[in-house]
Amino acid sequence: MSTSQYERFKEQLIEFHTAFKAPIARSFSEARQDQCALRVNLISEEYAEYKKAEDRHLVIDGLTDTLYVVVGTAITVGIDPMVVELPPPPVNPTPFKSLFDGQIIGLVRKLTERVLCYRGLLSHLTEVYHKINQASVNYGFSLTSAMNIVHASNMTKLWSANEKDHLMAAAGELYTFEPSGIPDRYIIKRKLDGKIIKPPSFVAPDLLSL
């Protein structure tokens, strides 16, 4: 785990947030507390998917999706986790899925406080980021490769004009839409909770090779 690795992940999430017009806080003074409920939902949902996954590619998908929303949370509150070097993986390791419920719960609690605490968020973001990296080592796959695949997939969540018009005609009362940060592409969100909805042209990540 290195600073350059995190910076690459951060660049990917900035690209995603720019395309989907999600908040990007350049420092803690720009932290978007109004977005914290959504961040909590995303983190909880993706970590739950990771916990229940059994097949290898689904475990990798769940862990990488958890990292994706955690890094997205970091740029939403303007705090970069501290990078901690991990020991090298053992030769011929036996893969196992490691859990980190306590760290996830701690981060969620900090995100739901009435007043956001810089030190508390920094500590818990760092712990979760470290645990995700350690979990990828324990399970025996490249987190960087997985993030590249998942990020490419996530960028296909933008809707074409034809896809958007078809959905809004069929069930427009359930969704909102707006132009994205990319020309001729649209963002569709569920009104209930603001979650981004995938278009028919969405390309799922293929993690079977990892």
Where on the chain are the PLM-derived regions?
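Flexible "arm" and connector segments at domain edges
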Residues: 1-210
